[in-house]
Amino acid sequence: MPALRAGARITIVAPASAIAGAADEAAEWLLERGYEPQVMPAARARLAPPFDYLAGDDAARLADLHAAFADPAVGAVWCLQGGFGSWRVLDQIDYGLLRRHAKPFIGYSDVTALHLAIQRYAGFVTFHGPMLAQDLLAGRQAPTEQALLDMVSGRLGAGSWIAAPPQARLATLASGVATGRLIGGNLALLAALTGTRYAIDARDGILFFEDVNEALPRVDRMLAQLRRAGAFDGVRGVLVGSFTRLLGVPGDGEAAQAALYPLVREHFQARGIPVLAGWPSGHGDPNLTLPLGARVTLDAGRGALRLEQPVAV
């Protein structure tokens, strides 16, 4: 994977939803940091009801994605925000084109659908990291931006440890060390893609999941759905990310998130694998970047990840 260089062109895409005016603000944000921003048309668009949750029609969003990858002058493809609709274009993506022009692709939440599809059919590492409108324009904590730059710029190589900031309240639900390919993303999207050719396969991998605005019974149901579909068969370790604004649980933050942990234990304890929870990646603040598709080691007792391969060079 080519690393993102200083002053590189970064293309802003909106494969799902968009917010009016956010694309131009994001371009200014990139410009202030010395990059050359390029805004694709759908990132400035929004369909009329009932499809007003989409940033442009499927053909336009797909064309933006293809053009961003095909352009050799583009150093990274960065999603403006999540929302809804990334899954609508999965069948039409030219995965061969993406494979031939692999470059850092950054996003999370609804973009999980693209992460899974790209890893399965294009075969390169993608970055579960902050989005421009959803995170960086919203003023996330400093580790959010720095962790992304460290990951995509090639500063981290094989053997580098990825640690959560000191204020993170990690919880070792099951101790141990495991090595495998990091795979996962937003839990609702992982469950929604069950039974399709884009479904997650965590065999011999380290499973990561996170979510926002979910109730514990729904989290329980989604985990049960994935487990019964065989998605967890052969998984070597589990990394539980941010679960922000758990519905029906008083408060927010790490203390509220701990209400989730007995449920997670129930779903994975029989497997005898390491489980680390409270990792600050996803819809929380900070939102640390993870290299999906990369080989990593999870040390649940130490509360850290180690890269077993370079992810950007």
Predicted ranges, named:
Residues 198-260:
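Internal helical hairpin/lid segments
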Residues 93-117, 125-132:
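Short, acidic/small-residue loops that bind anionic groups at enzyme active sites
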